[in-house]
Amino acid sequence: MRDSTSFLAQQIRAYVSYQEASDHWNDASYEVNLHLFDKYCEKNYPNAANLSQEMVDTWCRKRKTESNNSCRSRIYAVVSFVRYLRSRGLTVITDPVIPRKEVREYIPHSFTEEELRNFFAACDSIPEAPTIEEQRSRRITVPVFFRLLYSSGIRTTEARLLRTGDVDLDRGILNIRYSKGHDQHFVVLHESMLELLIQYDDAISKLYPNREYFFPARSRNGGGHTRAWVQNNFRNMWFKYNSGYAVPYELRHNYAIENINSWTNEGFGFTAKLLYLSKSMGHSVIESTKYYYSLVPGLADIIEAQTDESAVIPEVDYESY
């Protein structure tokens, strides 16, 4: 993170170090918004020595141009920072008013076979640059990283933060330690994906012999890739041959839908397969997996007929699943 320049500098540095060590730091939103809050305090309270309730409440107040969700995104890093200080007895400031989360209606992109072929063809055709280590690393990593998302349904964050010790290349199992809600779970890899990871591990180890992260970032001294890296590379590969809008997270949706679609003519064992899918995708309760009912035409009726259970489609925010 950029250097803090307000009276909060020391506490912000300690907070950032703690979040990074806990694998809870989000470069895309935390860094930007915490930096803006730091500048706000420096400008408006140049003589202050301690954080006050007024500073926090004024900054976190919902602006006229903001929706509830955009306000939540802007202030969450500050709320987290305040909670960090309070848990250590460094402040008595209470949480500011946090707007209620708005449920968004979201229909993810439905991939066609042609689009997926185009996308992975683009991933496989990244040009060589033997003298540029970062480009060599990118050429090795991008095709494997996105195939892992496609074939396993893991979240983009889970893939980014995989350590080498989390990937069992002997048994073909991923240990997902950092997940939404921090629920550890395991994912069994398809044989073809396991073989690809073995080849990748051999190639990337020559560039990063003692790497900590399974997918190391040259620009971060071997640390994990950022959310922006995933988004930018997906966008570049996607639009090379495709036109419709899509985002990386939708590979997870595709994984769930393809699995569920393949079961619709099976009565026996349907519930067990749904439970397995739920666990492998890191859902703490099977109700979370019901979100995908709304994405497969007629599936709710099929499930009700096969399991004698009413498939009630929950109102959820897609990013939660």
List each language-model region with its residue ranges.
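Conserved catalytic core of the tyrosine transesterase superfamily
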Residues: 1-321
